[in-house]
Amino acid sequence: MSKSDLNLLVENIKFEHLSIFYDFILSVLNTLSISDFELSVILCDNVYIQKLNNKFRNKNEPTDVLSFNYNEVNEDLVDGINYKIQGDLIISFEYLKFSAQEFNVEIYEELQRVTIHGILHLMGYKHETNDFQKEGMLILQENILRKNKRVF
């Protein structure tokens, strides 16, 4: 029996588009053929994510997104990819303001991009570089974004 559980939380920031964001995440999961999931997404500020980044990665600095996968090693992998997600995504909305400026995109587009990125990592996808032209995971990420992009 498959589970579908998506929780959105907001820590130390204002975010008024939870319903649009919620629908976006469900659409991405559907595009990826994921119907069995327990996923929590926390939108936060730089202080919140920096504490977690320091605690779990020994990097005392903020970052855009952290993925925490709670899946046990299982036999449900298809070519190394897990279609059953159990984990948390922590996203610094404050950090995304800087990334969006750097990449010359709207902040909500960047939010959607890093959300997809985190979900792909929870599935087991990896990338060695940030080359959007050559890295399979990043090409997939951009294709999913094009198919599911929302206006906030």
Curated annotation (Swiss-Prot):
What are the binding positions for Zn(2+) in this chain?
H117, H121, H127
Any idea what job this protein has? Single strand-specific metallo-endoribonuclease involved in late-stage 70S ribosome quality control and in maturation of the 3' terminus of the 16S rRNA.
Q: Which organism is it from?
A: Borreliella afzelii (strain PKo)
User: What is the protein named?
Assistant: Endoribonuclease YbeY
Instruction: Provide the alphabetized UniProt keywords.
Output: Cytoplasm, Endonuclease, Hydrolase, Metal-binding, Nuclease, Ribosome biogenesis, rRNA processing, Zinc
Q: Which InterPro entries match?
A: MetalPrtase_cat_dom_sf_prd, YbeY, YbeY_CS
Cellular component GO terms, alphabetical: cytoplasm
Where is it chiefly localized?
A: cytoplasm
Q: How is the cofactor bound?
A: Binds 1 zinc ion.
Instruction: Offer one example of a GO biological process linked to this entry.
Output: rRNA processing
Signal peptide extent = none
